[in-house]
Each structure stands twice: as structure tokens, then as C-alpha cells.
């Protein structure tokens, strides 16, 4: 930020508000460090208003944003740009008896009143992540169970509280852990101190030994399950999706999203054993697997001495993998690292192997493909555990209330803006999983949440959120209402002038491709 302090700046983003108003504060501060003052005063003025909407507060925030923030929505340019549709397919599956037993055992364990394996200050967050890994695959949860047992072993031998490498291990598998941890801490009340780990008695040590035994039994059961029902259904889901793409005339390409790197590796092996050998590429935070390194080396060699190479290994690695997916691979298996910052409009099939509870994250995923430049309707495949009542209710909310999987616009800004934050919504879902034990309790809890959402997505709320999120420039639609053919001709004339000037000045220093109106220095 300091290096650009005195330079004119334009920040372009498709997702200015995701999980928190503090993201807005951060973006605005890059443009104008004095727009909102310090972060404490901003939080005091606006953060609490996010959960208790106040027309006057939102109007004030809107006025303060006007000088630095302009927004154009799809609906405002729909008559000038042909946006494609999105359509949903559901792949249902039933877990095997062994998978169901593992789920029940771990779920019951997480619902215990007292757990030693989870750091006291992170109990809620760790419980949410463990449930996400449990839903992802037996491979994802088994590694984490092993680490938790190891943490307890350390506590028993040293009688000293400690993390025991839990943070590092979970963040290596569940890549959004650090980000989620920061969001959860940010979402807590200001001034709330983290609880200290207690000192342990001999009685505690005995209970720890019993907990270690239970965790190791869970781990043993998880490792004994070599095939997952959901994984076995993946091939069927892909073929259904590819059949739909063929009908649409789209390329046979799919991106599969998972929240776990262990699950990612399991899916790679499964697909390569089922006819997709040599057609799969991985995308994750580190991108340090042998195949990715090979792709990167070949890409650098191919594009050396061109402006495609940025000099940033991280950025170039991402570009290399995306290019490989476009030109060579059929399937990309990605973690949340691919949900931001890459453009995949050449791909028309999105598979949510794991479905996040945060609707804003889902919208980000689908937005990689369902974006400007996409020529075909985007097919979105979601997996649904028919033996899990809570999973079915979550999908119902995401599909029917947030409208994430169908239509031209997907989840509208009014609807995504109606929840306090993506983090808060995740917490609400996690609480239902944690507190409800019977299908009746689950039904009641989700009905209450749905009722709240219906109230929050009322006409009054829509109007308030629209004023904040959309109408920074109320004349934008009128400004765009010009004759389309005239505007094309007008642009064409000036583009040709610019092209001819460029060729004149760079004629000796660049290779020009006239048919594509592009050049390489």
C-alpha cells in the first residue's frame, strides 16, 4: 500500500464484499487511507450495523463510498452482453455401513461436553473444520484424527498444554484454515480474550488416555475404508455433466472443487484409474507436486522472453496450470485456492465435490466459470448425502433461498447481503450440526433459520442492501443506454487508430498478429 501511496490507482474486482465489511475497509484504505479513519472507529460505526441494519447508517456509508467506489452489475448491462445461464444437477449417494458408522462415531465425539484434543480457545472453529473434513472423505478425516491423538499423547507425557502441530497439519489439508481462523477471530466481540488452556489433574490425564484410545479407533476405522461412496459416484456425475456439455456444444472440461488436499489426491487417483490418466491437473495453494512443477518448467521455457512471464513464481505457476487445463487437461481438481483470482470461462462444468456452508464461497467458485466471456451455459453438479438430514437441509437453503445454482445471476447481492456475514452463517449451520441429534431437532432448527432468512430478505432489507451494494452510480444504466451498433462502430474506429499507432511505434520491437490484434514484445 505504501509503495503505491502517491500513484493514481484503479482497483478492479468482481467481489468487493465477501465475508466482512472489514474487507471493504481494507480496499478503500488502499485508495484513500483517510476515508474512514482508523479501523477501530470504522468497526465502532459500521460493523455492528451489519447485524442490526439502520437506514441512516447505510446512507452515511453510501455517501462516504461514493467518491471512491463505482459498481456495475450484470443486470445493468444485460441488454448489451449476452450472459449465459447456470443450471444444477444433483448427484445423490448413500454412505456404506462403515462410512456411516465412522460419521456417527466422530459426530458423537464432537458433541461431547468436554474434549481434550481440541484447543479450548478454538473448539468451535476446529469442530466446524472436522465436520467439513468428515464430510469430504475418510482420507481427509483420518489424517486429522491421527494428529489430534498425537496432541493428546504429548499432553499426557508432558502435562503441558500446547498445540501439538494441529494448526500446521490442518492448514496443510484444509487450506482455508488460516483465513477462516482470522475471520472467526475478527467476528468475535472486541476485547474478548482467548481462554487459557487449563492445568490438568490426574483425573484429566486418565480421561485423555481414554480419548486417545477413541481417536485411534476412529482413525483405524477411517483407514480401513479404501473406497468412498461419494468418490465412486464421481464418475457418474462427470459423465452426466459431460453429456449436458455435449448437448450445449461446450468443451469437455470440468473443474472439481474440494476443501481437502487429501481428498484432492484421492480423487486424482480415482479418476486416473477410471480412464482419465494424463487428463487431470491439480490446483492448490502450494502447487508443489511433481506434475505442477513440470508444467511450470515447460511453461517458463515456452514463454521465456515474453511478457507472459511476470517474474512472480506464484503468479506464473497459477498461469501455467490454467493454460495446461485449457490446452491439455480435461479435469482440474482444485481446492479453494482456485476459487479466487483465476479465469476459467473456457470451462462450463463446475463440480462441488464438497459443498461449503458459506454461500459467498460457493458463488466465488461458480464465478470462475460463469463469468464474462463464457459462451455456454454453466452446469453445476452438487453431491448430496441422502442419509444425512442436515446435509439435505443445507443444500435446500443454498439452492432455494440463495438461488446459487440456477439462473443468469446466481445469488443476487441482495440475498448474499441479507446475511450478517458468510462467517456468521457458517457458525449458525455448525451450531445446528453440533446441537441437534435427531432428525426432528434438525428439521426444527433449519426451519427457524429459514424463517429468519425470509425475514432478512424482505423488501425493506433488499432496498437497504441495494443502496449500499449496488447503486453507487444511479445513472450507470442510462449511461449505457446507447445504440449498440453505433457504439461498436465508434469503438472500432478508435481501436484501429490505436492499432496503427502501436504498429508504427513498435514496428521494430514487436511481433504483430494482425488477425488477433495482438503483439509480443
Segments the model singles out, each with a brief description of its role:
Residues 12-16, 73, 138, 258-261, ...:
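A short beta-strand-to-loop transition that corresponds to the Sensor-1 phosphate-sensing loop
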Residues 376-521:
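C-terminal accessory region of SF2 helicases/translocases
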Residues 272, 277-391:
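Conserved RecA-like P-loop NTPase helicase motor core
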Residues 1-6, 29-168, 390-454, 458:
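Inter-lobe coupling linker of SF2 helicases/translocases
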